[in-house]
């Protein structure tokens, strides 16, 4: 086939053309020699013939090499034609992604739900429960996964009287008759202290899943509108046989799963709630399907809350210890927890000490009632655990000196209930009630204006108007009765707007 004008000549055609030219030159060199045979002698003719043979042998070797090259080129062109024909009939394959070895969003190693995520009512506190499986990010090739959650929340509060803690509803801070600010009238406050920053790290190890959790809000003791307050900073090793936790976390005496769904951060007065450094070991004693029996054990930092008298200051020789038993099923759970404490006072001048022991027991439980309804309940009783009770923590009521100079733990008890009703999956109401009482003996040297008993009640309506936003309103009522039987009541209406980035 002859190439058209301007068309490139294939390599095989060029080789054939070169072979033809060599053959022509060979014939041309032979013709003059034949005509010269008549005028030359026999010896000269033989010499010319020998020379011509050498030239023809050399040219034959060149032609063999060129033929070999021609065969190689033809084979290569044939292979290229087959590839081009296959490419024209096969759909194009998309180019591979430049980053495929370590995807940013983790799926295979991230916790994957084996069943639908549990229902969370709109009024549920943010950043408390185990985070949802979605939203983890892989940190390169380290094997670590990270989930970040930011919660921005604004609470608007209108009180009918002075509250000792304006950002929290604390019945023990309500003034009673005869105290300053009693019946002081309405006041308004805005707070963003329930805003949260939380980080959940996790990775797989030979011993199970290792989790490291960090969380803070802004209910610190510093000055300003947003004082920093760390809530969680702990590591936890989780496997089918046990969990081992170490760091800063809620006390093992607390059952956070029965905390009612209040918009107010403080919650019921009688709920046991305390943070601190600890080590916690929870072996699994028995399993039956999705249900299990565990034995939570913990050693926690002691924090004796006793009012200073003279040169005496509170201290503890031993750590706080807890021992519990928990039965948990997919729809309900019950927990029995016990607290053991060592409380002491020491004179800074002569080193004289007074010590007493403290013990408390608590029974808690929650259950799913209907598809969107749940109920919670708790009861605690003991001596020397006032620092674990929401309403009287920090008031120095763990223990007190008697009139004869003996240190004794103060008895306290509290109970409460909560109920959440889901009108729809995005609209819910929660109600709760709590009662708390302390019973110091008559000869104890404590301030008689401190609370003897308090009551708490709440009712709210919360609307999850988008996947990441909630709007709610809550009514709160509280009563404070002092050791002198003076009474005071307070009411609050709170509205809450919350944005939760990655629950």
Give residue ranges: language-model regions.
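Outer-membrane beta-barrel "beta-signal"
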Residues: 463-465, 489-503
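N-terminal signal peptide c-region/cleavage motif recognized by signal peptidases
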Residues: 31-33
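N-terminal periplasmic/intermembrane-space "pro-region" immediately following the signal or transit peptide
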Residues: 2, 35-165
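Detector for outer-membrane/organellar transmembrane beta-barrel domains
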Residues: 327-451
């Amino acid at each position: 086939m002859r190439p058209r004008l301007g068309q490139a000549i294939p390599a095989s055609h060029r080789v054939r053309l070169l072979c033809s030219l060599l053959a022509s030159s060979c014939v041309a060199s032979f013709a003059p020699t034949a005509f010269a045979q008549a005028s030359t002698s026999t010896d000269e003719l033989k010499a010319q013939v020998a020379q011509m043979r050498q030239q023809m042998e050399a040219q034959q070797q060149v032609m063999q090499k060129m033929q070999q090259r021609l065969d190689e080129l033809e084979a290569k062109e044939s292979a290229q034609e087959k590839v081009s024909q296959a490419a024209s009939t096969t759909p194009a394959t998309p180019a591979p992604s430049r980053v495929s070895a370590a995807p940013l969003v983790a799926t295979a190693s991230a916790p994957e739900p084996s069943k639908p995520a549990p229902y969370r009512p709109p009024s549920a506190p943010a950043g408390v429960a185990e985070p949802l499986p979605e939203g983890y990010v892989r940190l390169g090739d380290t094997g670590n996964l990270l989930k970040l959650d930011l919660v921005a929340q604004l609470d608007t509060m209108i009180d009918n009287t002075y509250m000792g803690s304006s950002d929290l509803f604390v019945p023990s801070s309500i003034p009673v008759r005869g105290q300053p600010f009693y019946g002081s009238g309405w006041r308004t406050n805005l707070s963003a202290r329930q805003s949260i920053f939380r980080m959940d790290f996790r990775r797989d190890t030979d011993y199970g899943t290792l989790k490291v959790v960090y969380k803070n809000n802004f209910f610190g003791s510093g000055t300003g509108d947003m004082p920093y307050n760390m809530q969680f900073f702990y590591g936890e090793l989780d496997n089918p046989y046990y969990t081992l936790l170490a760091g800063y976390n809620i006390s093992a005496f607390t059952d956070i799963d029965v905390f009612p769904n209040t918009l107010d951060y403080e919650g019921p007065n009688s709920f046991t709630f305390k943070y601190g450094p600890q080590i916690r070991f929870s072996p699994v004693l028995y399993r039956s399907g999705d249900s299990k029996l565990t034995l939570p054990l913990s050693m926690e930092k002691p924090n004796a809350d006793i009012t200073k008298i003279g040169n005496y200051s509170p201290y503890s020789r031993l750590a706080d210890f807890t021992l519990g038993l928990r039965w948990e099923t997919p729809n309900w759970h019950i927990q029995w927890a016990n607290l053991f404490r060592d409380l002491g006072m020491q004179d800074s001048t002569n080193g004289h000490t007074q010590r007493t022991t403290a013990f408390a027991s608590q029974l808690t439980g929650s259950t799913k009632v209907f598809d969107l309804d749940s109920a919670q309940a708790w009861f605690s009783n003991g001596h020397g655990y006032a620092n674990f009770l929401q309403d009287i923590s920090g008031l120095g009521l763990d223990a007190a000196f008697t009139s004869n100079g003996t240190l004794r733990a103060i008895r306290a008890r509290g109970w409460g209930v909560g109920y959440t009703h889901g009108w729809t999956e995005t609209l819910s109401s929660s109600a709760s009630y709590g009662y708390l009482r302390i019973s110091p003996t008559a000869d104890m040297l404590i301030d008689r204006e401190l609370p003897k008993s308090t009551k708490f009640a709440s009712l709210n309506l919360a609307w999850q108007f988008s996947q990441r936003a909630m709007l709610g309103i809550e009514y709160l009522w509280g009563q404070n009765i002092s050791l002198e039987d003076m009474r005071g009541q307070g009411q609050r209406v709170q509205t809450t707007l919350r944005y939760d980035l990655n629950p």
